[in-house]
Structure formats: structure tokens, C-alpha cells
């Protein structure tokens, strides 16, 4: 899923007053967390993630998490919108759905990729 697809999906399903730059910042934040907490903790060689900026190609940039877990982006942006609007009941609902997708993705990634090896003992 591309950045523009997520932004258009959220705008269609949850009309809001926030611009693309705010949503881009949220998507960059989420992918940064995914890269740091999940991807970089495994042996798979992944390029460093520098975030998305205003110069990022919204149509040509695919987000880090693919199908079937890509709904995480929708729920993350909806959660951020609900928080900014002070709608705590809606925020809690969006947060629960976001957390479900995040945990499912993390579990699937952990099953499919070997974690970085750590020393089992120290030689003195």
C-alpha cells in the first residue's frame, strides 16, 4: 500500500480537517517504530529507515507493512485523529484495532525471521 492510498482511505472513511503533511508525519512515525522495534531486531538485512518527508513521493512510496497487515496504517491514523480531536471513546476503539494489527504483524514477523544472535555466555 502506498502513502497516498492510506491517506485517501482515511480521508474517505473518516473525514477530517487534517492535511496530508500531518498524516505523512504519522505514517513516518509508525514505520520508524516498526523498523526500530521489529525489523532491526532480526538478522534480515534491511536498509536504514530515514522517515518520510515533504519531498517523499506519495504515489511511489510503499509503506513497510504489506498485506494482510496493512490496515494498521488506517487504524493508526484514525487513532491519531481521534486523539487530536479529543474523542477518547473513538480513540480507544481505534487504538484497540491498531494494537491488534501491530501485535499480529509483530508475531508473524517474529515467526518468519530469525532474531539477531546474542552471546549465550561470556568468556572471562
Tell me the role of every PLM-derived stretch.
Residues 92-106:
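Short secondary-structure subsegments characteristic of cysteine-rich extracellular domains
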Residues 44, 91-92:
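Short amphipathic alpha-helical leader/targeting segments
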Residues 80-91:
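Short helix-capping/linker segments at secondary-structure and domain boundaries
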Residues 87, 95-99, 116:
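Generic alpha-helical propensity signal that fires on short helical segments
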Residues 67-80:
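Elongated alpha-helical scaffolds
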Residues 1-62, 103-124:
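Conserved short "hinge" loops at termini or chain/domain junctions
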Amino acid at each position: 500500500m502506498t502513502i497516498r492510498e492510506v491517506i485517501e482511505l482515511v480521508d474517505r472513511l473518516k473525514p477530517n480537517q487534517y492535511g496530508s503533511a500531518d498524516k505523512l508525519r504519522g505514517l513516518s512515525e509508525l514505520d520508524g517504530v516498526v523498523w526500530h522495534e521489529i525489523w532491526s531486531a532480526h538478522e534480515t538485512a534491511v536498509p536504514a529507515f530515514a522517515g518520510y518527508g515533504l519531498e517523499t513521493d506519495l504515489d511511489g512510496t510503499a509503506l513497510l507493512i504489506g498485506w494482510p497487515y496493512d490496515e494498521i496504517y488506517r487504524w493508526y491514523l484514525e487513532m491519531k485523529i481521534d486523539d487530536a480531536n479529543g474523542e477518547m471513546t473513538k480513540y480507544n476503539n481505534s487504538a484497540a484495532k491498531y494494537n491488534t494489527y501491530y501485535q499480529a504483524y509483530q508475531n508473524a514477523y517474529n515467526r518468519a525471521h530469525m532474531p539477531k544472535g546474542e552471546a549465550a555466555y561470556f568468556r572471562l
